[in-house]
């Protein structure tokens, strides 16, 4: 058991396991865990949810392979400002995960659809420059049901109306996002040397939690970073694990969803990153999470 539970532990460890039952089965299982009054029952349900979450991860990964292929095909057809993906047998509970990851990777609003009958279900995820619920409201009569907010929404729609909706929302996206680059603006808080990150400063950064919407983690930049080693990690080699050095100090770093950029790490780099304590076998070390990097010039 970890000594401290962080917001990151909640966001990426605990909450997905609580959500998974509603995605694949029924939310009642997670409710039973929260209401459980005995340790044995809690452990039993928690193990089941952890197993179900691994199943969800595999289902989502397989669906994403197909979704990414569809994005490439659609972009070749000129559909650049909104991402449409879908397959009849995708489980409704993973549609938001598919749309969210594609939106994050391409920095464009994304809509994922599934269903075999007359009525289809869809989830939408967006970016700050595109108000999704406002866009859906502009053609609200076309849906059976819809709802959400600026960054995320969902709807049901008749199959016969899907093409018309796709044309309308694509037109809105082209109007709105024509000059928006395919990547979010990364706000840098300070240029530092990583050796500034010690017990005292990390404790100060921890005191600023919880991080999240409206209070993002501080992002630092360091120039002239030497890459000691770099390798792809993750089930599909999607991520980069690096050992880097700066001013003769060595640091561990991870760059999520940037495995395809491994060739760039053969050069000295300028990196933008966040920092956190990583606990392993009772020992704490500082790990850098690289948000972006470029070759140092």
Summary of predicted features, one role per range:
Residues 1-162, 185:
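Hydrophobic helix-and-loop "lid/oligomerization" segment in the mid-to-C-terminal part
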């Amino acid at each position: 058991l970890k000594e401290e539970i962080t917001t990151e532990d909640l966001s990426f460890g605990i909450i997905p396991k609580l959500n998974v039952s509603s995605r694949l089965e029924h939310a009642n299982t997670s409710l039973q865990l929260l209401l459980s009054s005995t340790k044995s029952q809690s452990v039993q349900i928690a193990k089941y949810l952890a197993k179900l979450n691994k199943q969800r991860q595999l289902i989502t990964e397989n669906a994403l392979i197909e979704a990414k292929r569809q994005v490439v095909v659609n972009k070749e057809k000129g559909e650049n400002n909104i991402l449409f993906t879908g397959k009849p047998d995708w489980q409704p509970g993973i549609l938001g995960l598919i749309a969210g990851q594609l939106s994050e990777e391409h920095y464009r609003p994304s809509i994922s659809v599934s269903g075999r009958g007359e009525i289809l279900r869809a989830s939408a995820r967006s970016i700050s420059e595109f108000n999704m619920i406002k866009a859906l409201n502009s053609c609200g009569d076309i849906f059976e049901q819809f709802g959400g907010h600026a960054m995320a929404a969902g709807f049901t729609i008749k199959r016969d109306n899907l093409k018309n909706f796709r044309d309308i929302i694509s037109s809105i996206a082209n109007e709105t996002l024509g000059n928006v680059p395919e990547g979010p603006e990364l706000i840098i808080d300070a240029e530092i040397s990583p050796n500034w990150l010690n017990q005292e400063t990390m404790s100060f950064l921890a005191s600023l939690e919880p991080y999240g919407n409206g209070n993002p983690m501080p992002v630092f930049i360091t120039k002239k970073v030497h890459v000691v080693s770099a390798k792809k990690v993750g089930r599909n080699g999607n991520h980069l694990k690096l050992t880097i050095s700066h001013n003769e100090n060595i640091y561990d770093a991870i760059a999520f969803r940037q495995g395809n950029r491994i060739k760039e790490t053969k050069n000295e780099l300028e990196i933008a990153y966040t920092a956190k304590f990583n606990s392993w076998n009772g020992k704490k070390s500082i790990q850098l999470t690289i948000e972006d990097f470029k070759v140092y010039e």
